[in-house]
Regions:
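Short N-terminal micro-motifs specific to bacterial/archaeal maturation
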Residues: 1, 23-26, 58
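Local sequence-structure signature of Cys/Sec-based thiol-disulfide redox active-site neighborhoods
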Residues: 1-20
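Charged, low-complexity surface patches
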Residues: 5-6, 25, 40
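Stable alpha-helical elements in mature extracytoplasmic
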Residues: 6, 13, 28-31, 63-67
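Conserved helix-turn-beta segment immediately C-terminal to the redox Cys motif
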Residues: 14-34
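Thiol/selenol-based redox catalytic cores and closely related redox-interacting motifs
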Residues: 38, 44-120
Length: 120
């Protein structure tokens, strides 16, 4: 996970993933925005942290179930998933034990095509 060392909501999202049994490695690049650009993230999908798994990008506060579903069957040409911005009721932002709501999970591919994957 590429993130700012001072971002608390990123740390909360990481805690959720670790509680679910995922081994998370954290990187604090000097210039996070430049790192995102170098990875190929479309800037309109930007959030506070970027996760790279098996060469795919996962931007922002994506629920674990959406990441797992994507990794189980990645669409041809796909680059990853994103939850743009910092939605208040997303993983790492929502109060514990509250249902996720008010945001969309967007798929993006190498051609720049955006696809609605899930909506909470």
């Amino acid at each position: 996970v590429y993130k700012s060392p001072t971002c608390g909501c990123c740390a909360e999202w990481i805690k959720i993933m670790e509680k679910k049994g995922h081994d998370v490695k954290i990187k604090h690049p000097f210039n996070l925005k430049s790192t995102k650009k170098d990875l190929g993230l479309p800037m309109q999908l930007e959030s506070c942290h970027t996760t790279v798994i098996d060469g795919y990008l996962f931007e922002g506060h994506i629920p674990e179930r959406d990441i797992l579903a994507f990794l189980a069957n990645p669409p041809e040409g796909a680059m990853g998933l994103a939850v743009p911005g910092m939605p208040q009721m997303s993983p790492g932002m929502a109060p514990r034990n509250k249902a996720y709501s008010g945001f969309k999970v967007i798929g993006f591919d190498k051609a720049g095509k955006l696809t609605l994957v899930n909506q909470y």
